[in-house]
Amino acid sequence: YATYKDQLPEVMMGNVKYDGKYYGVPTTMNIVGMFANMDLLAQVGYNEVPATYDELIDCCDKLVAKGIIPFGCSGKETWCVTEYLESIIEKTAGATALNDIFAGRASWDNADVAKAVGIFQEMIEKEYFDPNGIALTNDEVKANFMAGKYAFYMNGTWNCADFAKAGLDFVKVSEFPVIDSSKSQLGELIGGPSD
């Protein structure tokens, strides 16, 4: 580790460290990004990915009114649902609170998590998600996004290579917007080192 420590950001090392010693070397780092189909967003007056939560809701309302499905999410693979929910929790409660929950220092049973789950439920009730998504795999949802069926697709940045290879120049990646700026901020993301 001493030979390579300057090339490995400390933020990547948490998953390979135990009891003060390093037992692995992460080779990649991925985050959950909010991929946007800019061609579909332009149809409802958005030339940039919505930067605030209010803008995202406005954009989604306009997409639904135009008959465009805002989000695709695989319900068949629950980790995909988790990527949405964790992002909403983080943008509501903040990264520190979410990390405390993951580490067992705090409970899932708290007001911020309840608020985030309520926001997610409201998005479902407002028909922001493909109603057929519950029966789709992630690969099917990703293919639908690539075919222009959804305005947004939240998933890992490992998808960037596939989108570039397919020549999808209409795709732009951002992050889910902050919901509670007193607890969260841009740049606090779900994800981390892997491999």
Describe each region flagged by the PLM.
Residues 44-48, 121-135, 149, 166-170:
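A local structural motif
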Residues 138, 155-160, 177:
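Beta->alpha turn/N-cap motifs
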Residues 1-8, 92-115, 165, 178-189:
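Short, solvent-exposed loop/beta-turn-alpha elements that line the ligand-binding surface or hinge
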Residues 60-62, 102-134:
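Glycine-centered hinge/linker elements that transmit conformational signals in sensory
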Residues 42-44, 126, 165-195:
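Extracytoplasmic/periplasmic substrate-recognition and gating elements
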Residues 1-11, 15-17, 39-51, 143-144, ...:
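Extracytoplasmic "Venus flytrap"/periplasmic binding protein-like
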Residues 1-33, 57, 83-84, 111-112, ...:
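Hinge/lid segment of periplasmic solute-binding proteins
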Residues 51-57, 132-146:
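Short helix-initiation/N-cap motifs at beta->coil->alpha
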